[in-house]
Structure formats: C-alpha cells, structure tokens
Amino acid sequence: MRFAKENPLIEGYFSRRKCLQSILIGGQSILFSEHSTAGAQIEEPLMDAVRTALTSAIANHAPPVPEFKDTESRIRYLRWLVAMSDRLKKKKPEWQIRKEFLQTVWYESKRAGLDETLVLGLIQVESNFRKFAVSSVGARGYMQVMPFWTRVIGDGDASKLFHMQTNLRFGCVILRHYLDREKGDRFMGLGRYNGSRGKSPYPDAVLGAARNWEFSG
C-alpha cells in the first residue's frame, strides 16, 4: 500500500474511505494510512451533573502506575505488555516509548472501565499510533480528541491534547461517556465517538482493528 508523504510539521490527512478500504479482516493484518481519519466527536449540550462527572473523570489524580491485587494479575499484565510491545514495534521502535505508551493505555482503559483491546483498536483507526496526528476537522493526538472537549471538561488548553496521558485520558473518558449514553452498545457508542452514529464503516473498522490486539494470556 502506498502512503502519502508525511509533512514534518503536521500530519497529513487521508479520507475515512481510503483508511477503511485498507482493512483486511479475517486473521490478516489491518493496514492503515499514516494519517488520522476525518471523523470527529460532535459537541452536544451536557447536563450539569454529566459535565461535573466528566470533569472529575479527567482530573489527573495519579500517574499511570499499574496496581495489582495479586501476583497472578501482575504476571498477566507483564505478559500482555510483552505481547503488545512486540506487535507495536514497527510503529514505535524504542522500547521505553512503547512501554510508557502501553502502560498508559492499560491504565487509562482500566480507569475508565474499558477493554484495552478496544482502545488500541480505536487508536489504530483514529491516528495509526501517531502522537501528533491532526485530522482535517482538527481532532488531535492518539485518540483524535476534538479541542472543544478541553473547554467543556478541561482547562481550555487544547495544546495539552498532544500530551500522551492527557490525550488517552480524555479519549477514554469520552468513549466511556458515549458507551454509557448508548447503554453499552459498542456499535452505537463508537459511532458517536466518530460523529457517525448509526453508520457501520467506523464501528466495523475499530472492532476489526481490535482483533489485532486480542490477548489470551
């Protein structure tokens, strides 16, 4: 597959159609462009209670240091980390960077009550693991968070969406919010996340990509 040349200052853009056409489902690898997709969350009115809950959810109370209830859980996490690190090596060649990224994905996924497999699939589709990806509609970072969210539930500084943990926290909290609104329906929740509620291409792409990150332990 041919990729567009990468702009050294800002990520270029591929259309969602071209990104989705590159998916090969059914045990094969899923290939994506080096650029972000064009979907975007839609700003909607939030009840005060919801806004307060989301604001609290993104508050940075602790660094992403995994905690385990027993040795077995810790060993399973370490096995997951090794397996995911091997799969991510082509995208992030440096071990320390891979480790920090995966550790943060795991932490923020668990914190938001999400399956880390789903989160990794979403990141693959949204940004192809590009920290500084920017879409044609302005969504930023790994999880392509729209800047308006920093105003709605953050401090208004959209530049922080290029910070790894901040982006992953916002993304996970927003995804959790959308899934809750859809009563746990992944298809509809993912559609909301992408601003394409009720349409199949995006949810199908994320759920397909998530298969690349399944781990049996």
Predicted regions and their residues:
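A general, composition-driven signal for non-globular sequence regions
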Residues: I10-S15, S22, P45, F68, ...
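Catalytic glycan-binding domains that act on GlcNAc-containing polysaccharides
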Residues: A59-G217
